[in-house]
Amino acid sequence: KYEAAKGLYFKTRFKVNDATQSDFAVGLVITDTAVIDGTTDGIFFRKADGSTSMELVIEKDSTETTVSCGTAADDTFMTLGFYYDPKDRKFHVYKDNVKVGTGVNTNAPDNEDLAVSFGIQNGEAAAKVMTMDYISAGKERTANTEL
């Protein structure tokens, strides 16, 4: 669960076989069966069909803040990640271990439990493949009693 006073991070390494004709989402979202185009709350990376542009989405109650984070390429591994810094209250966004932007926490989902989620959807009548290498997520602990 996102909390404004605690650090939070997410990082993944993956690839998709067709960067243009696919949609994908990967990140932390509420439990939902429609991760790509139906989630209402989360902090996740998204790419829409027909484009190679990716963005970090910070969404609460269907209101989004987005941060552009570069482009995807066919069948090429990439790392995407973010770190939420409670000191400046911003999400610091990274692609291939290089900082590409920051986003404010205005629409951070602070009233929902979030789960690691990912999905791919084809954008044409052909199978699309997402290959996940790893996903890592964590949250700052501030007391010995926290798990």
Sequence positions of predicted segments:
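Short beta-strand segments enriched in hydrophobic/aromatic residues
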Residues: 14-16, 30, 84-86, 120-122
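Short tryptophan-centered beta-strand motifs in secreted/extracellular beta-sheet-rich domains
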Residues: 10-12, 75-86, 91-93
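Short, aromatic/His-centered strand-loop micro-motif at the edge of beta-sheets
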Residues: 58-79
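Extracellular beta-strand elements of beta-rich domains used
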Residues: 80, 133-137
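Secretory/extracellular carbohydrate-interaction modules
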Residues: 1-54
